[in-house]
């Protein structure tokens, strides 16, 4: 029986990538800086002390981080009791966004640029907004700028409730984000609007990676908070991913947990399970691992690392999240059978100590555990697509166009 358990720790970078200078991210190091702040006693909100992640250490994260940056994270040394193969990978996709990272992991790097809304104010062209307004029968939008999601709902949420005008905003990523109140605007209306925006972007050749629904609740700016009902309406993959190949060539199953299905536009997904919150995502993953049959991929994205702690530059929260995940990791490891593969990786960085609120261009860990495979150092992988190619080889699928087998 062959099964792959692929877990993406969203934004868990381990040191700036070779091309980080193109993104003004030289020196960024999501993992390393979290470890440093914990060691120095500067990440004690809701937790305390040095970062405690024994299971990640056992899988090789410390050794992988050292190979990525040339030095061990502060307070750690070489781990000799590692049970997994470990290495690190750099991205060849043009962007440092979720879609590019996940597609490249699945063997389809995004080599051409997405369309970006670069203007900080009046970010979306009036001609585009007018098309959306007419088709959606809206009276208008508010926002239309680069913004942090939590900041903009605090600033414009009350006006949105009064006017029923959706809040639209973007970032340095290729995204069109729409924030609406779940009660006063309606969750189904928000999803319908996002589908309309996705349709118009595609029709008029705006190569925008994602339209993101950002629902929130609360009665005033002191109470507004985003809910777990976020949805991503992604552009469809323009080549066959390894998850689609598994379904097509082996009649396999791909169980998508969290926002995975949205990232691939539902393509190559057999079953979509919506879970929210780090603990629940881990519980759902464990539940599906126990049920997984032959020729199955259980594919989980742990979004909280990115959305709750990375973008919000919350070092303590990120550290606490890593410790929570590590506490669930022992059970995950125990469920991996002789012919299974457990793969832990990330899609980009989002250093909570870095300037701004955006992603950071970083190397990502590649940790592969299987009781039936001899552990080794995987080296510096020159593309995330090596993960997709490794999965393709493991399931005896036809070769992917990018990447090399690591095993």
UniProtKB/Swiss-Prot annotation:
The keyword Nucleotide-binding does not apply. It is an enzyme of class 5 (isomerase). Its EC number is 5.4.2.7. GO terms for cellular component: cytosol. CDD domains: PPM. It comes from the Bacteria. Pfam families: Metalloenzyme. Mn(2+) 2 binds at residues 306, 311, 359. SUPFAM superfamilies: Alkaline phosphatase-like, DeoB insert domain-like. Its cofactor is Mn(2+). One of its GO terms (biological process) is metabolic compound salvage. It is found in: Cytoplasm. Binds 2 manganese ions. Isomerase that catalyzes the conversion of deoxy-ribose 1-phosphate (dRib-1-P) and ribose 1-phosphate (Rib-1-P) to deoxy-ribose 5-phosphate (dRib-5-P) and ribose 5-phosphate (Rib-5-P), respectively. This is Phosphopentomutase. It comes from Buchnera aphidicola subsp. Acyrthosiphon pisum (strain APS) (Acyrthosiphon pisum symbiotic bacterium). The gene is deoB.
């Amino acid at each position: 029986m062959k099964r792959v358990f692929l877990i993406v720790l969203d934004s868990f970078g381990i040191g700036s990538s070779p091309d980080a200078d193109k993104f003004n991210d030289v020196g960024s190091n999501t993992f390393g800086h979290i470890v440093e702040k914990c060691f120095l006693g500067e990440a004690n909100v809701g937790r305390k002390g040095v970062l405690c992640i024994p299971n990640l250490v056992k899988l090789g994260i410390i050794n992988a981080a050292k190979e990525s940056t040339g030095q061990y994270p502060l307070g750690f040394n070489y781990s000799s009791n590692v049970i997994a193969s470990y290495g690190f990978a750099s991205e060849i996709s043009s962007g440092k966004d979720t879609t590019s990272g996940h597609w490249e992991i699945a063997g389809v790097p995004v080599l051409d640029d997405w369309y970006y809304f670069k203007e900080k104010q009046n970010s979306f062209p009036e001609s585009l907004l007018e098309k959306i307004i007419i088709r959606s029968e809206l009276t208008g939008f508010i926002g239309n700028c680069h913004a942090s999601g939590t900041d903009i709902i605090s600033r414009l949420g009350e006006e949105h409730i009064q006017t029923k005008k959706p809040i639209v905003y973007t970032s340095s990523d290729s995204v069109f984000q729409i924030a609406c109140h779940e009660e006063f605007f309606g969750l189904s209306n928000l999803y319908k609007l996002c589908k309309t925006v996705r349709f118009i972007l595609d029709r008029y050749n705006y190569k925008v990676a994602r339209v993101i629904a950002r629902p929130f609740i609360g009665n005033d700016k002191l109470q507004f908070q985003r809910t777990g009902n976020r949805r991503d309406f992604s552009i469809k993959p323009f080549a066959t991913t390894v998850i689609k190949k598994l379904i097509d060539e082996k009649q396999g199953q791909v169980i998508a947990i969290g926002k995975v299905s949205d990232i691939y536009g539902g393509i190559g997904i057999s079953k979509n399970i919506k879970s929210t919150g780090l603990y629940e995502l881990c519980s759902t993953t464990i539940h599906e691992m126990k049920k997984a049959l032959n020729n199955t991929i259980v594919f989980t994205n742990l979004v909280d690392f990115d959305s709750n702690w990375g973008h919000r530059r919350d070092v303590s929260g990120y550290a606490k999240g890593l410790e929570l995940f590590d506490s669930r990791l022992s059970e995950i490891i125990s469920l991996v059978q002789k012919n299974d593969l457990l793969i832990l990786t990330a899609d980009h960085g989002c250093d909570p100590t870095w300037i701004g609120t955006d992603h950071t261009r970083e190397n990502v860990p590649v940790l592969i555990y299987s009781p039936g495979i001899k552990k080794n150092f995987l080296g510096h992988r020159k593309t995330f697509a090596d993960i997709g190619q490794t999965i393709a080889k493991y399931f005896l699928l036809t070769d992917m166009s990018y990447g090399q087998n690591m095993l």
